[in-house]
Amino acid sequence: MKRQRCKVFLVSLLLLAMLFGCAAPAAAPEAATPEAELPEATASLTAEPTDAVTQPDPLGTAVREDSDAVNAAYAKQYFDIVFSETVTQQEFVTALERVQHVQSTVTLAAADAAAALQGHSAVSLAVAGAGLAELAAVYTQEKIDATLQGLEVEGTVAADFACALDTGLVNRERAQVLAKNEAVDAALATRLLMAVATHNGTARNMMGYTDDPETYARIMNMWNTIMAANDPASLCEDETLVNVGVQILMEGVATGFNIVDISRDGRFLPELTINYFHDDIRHLRQVIGLLNSEGIVCKVQINPEFSVYQYLPEWDDDEPTPTYKVVQMAEDFYVVNTIGYFMELEFANAEDRLAFDALIKEVAKKNSGEEGKALLHNSWWQPTYESYVEVDDTYYEVYDQTISHGTYLMRIGTLDDILTPLQELAGEDCTVAQGKYWINDAYWRYMNGEDQ
C-alpha cells in the first residue's frame, strides 16, 4: 500500500528545522472533546471581562474563583452535569458521586431525595463528598466558634460549616448565604460541586496560576526530575506504543511522533485554552512572566513529551545529552529521542485568550531584519500553539491523529488524513482516533514548509 508522507509538527526537530533558519516545536496531547453541548451560560464566557474573583483568606494568600459561567461550562464538559434551577438533594448527591475519585470509599445519602437542596444540607453533603466528614466530627465547640465568628449556625451542621471554611470549600461570604438555610440555586450548587471536585483531584490538574510565584518552582521541580533521569525515553515506559511509532516512521507514514502521559493532562476548559509548545523550560517560564506582566492571569499546566523522529547519519550529531539521544532501531535506521514541553494555558476569558497571539508575535517571535530586537529567551522563528476549538480566522484547521495504549497517548498532527494507515499499523492493542484542532499562523506556515 502506498504510504503517504506527512508533515508532522515536532518540538524535537530542532536540528532539521535549523537548516531552514527556524526551530521546530512539538505536538500536544489530546484535550477533552470540545464537541459536547455546553450550557447557555457558556455564551457569557466571551462577554465577561474576567472570570477570576480574588478574595483574601486568613493566610493572606489569593483564593481565585471562576465565574458561574465557567463553572457551569466545566461541570457540563467534564462531568456532564447541568443542575435544575431548583436543585434537589438527590441531584446534588448524584453530582457529587460523579466527582469522586475512582477509588473513593465515600458514601452519600440524602435524607429527602426529592426535597429542594438547602444551605445546611448542601454544606454537609459537600464536606462528606470531599472526604472531610471525619475531620468535621473532631471539631470542638471552641474551634467551631472561633472559625464561624458569628455565623448563625447551630447543631451538628456547625462543625461542617467550620470545616468547609477551614478547608476552602466555601468562603465566608458564601457561608453566610448558605447559613440562612434557603434553597440553593444552580449556580451555587455548581460552585460547591467544583470545590469538591478540586479537593478530590478530579477537576483541573495544574501547576498553578501565572501570578503565583510558586508556579515557577513547581515547573523547575518537574524539570529537575526529568533532567536527573538523563534519558528522554524515561518519559515513556510503554514499549508497545513506542514500537508502533517507530514502525510508522519506518513505513514512511509520518516523519515523527510525540508521546505524553495522559495523567498529566490539565483538564482545562477547551474554549478558554491555548496549548503552547517549546523545548526550553526557561522560555516557558518567561512566557508565564510575560502574561503576568500584562495583567493576564490564567491557569498553567506543563506537560513534558517524548518526541521521536528519524535521524540521518549525514547530520553527524549523535552526541547524547539529557534531552537528546540517537538510537539505532534497525539496520540503517536510526531515530532521535528528544524531550519537549507543551504548556496548557486556560485564560480567564475569551478576550485574554485572543490577546495571547499578539503578545507572542511581539516579544517571542524572530523576524528577518529584526535581529537586534529584544525577545524572550530562545524565541523561535515560528512560535507555535493550538486550540481544540475555533479561535478566529488567524488559526487554521488540521488533522489530529492519536494512538493510545495504557496511560500513554501518541499524537501526530498532519495536513492530510492518515487515519487508515495508522489503524493498520497500530494493531488491536492500541486505540486510534482522529480529530481536528486549530493552529496559529506560524505553526501553519511551518507545516506547509515555510521557514518564517
Outline where the language-model segments fall.
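Sec-dependent N-terminal signal peptides of Gram-positive bacterial secreted proteins and lipoproteins
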Residues: R3-A26
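Eukaryote-specific, cytoplasm-facing alpha-helical/coiled-coil scaffolding segments in long proteins
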Residues: T190, Y216-N221, L312-D318
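Solvent-exposed, polar/charged alpha-helical surfaces in well-ordered, non-transmembrane soluble domains
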Residues: Q90, T94, S121-S124, A158-A162, ...
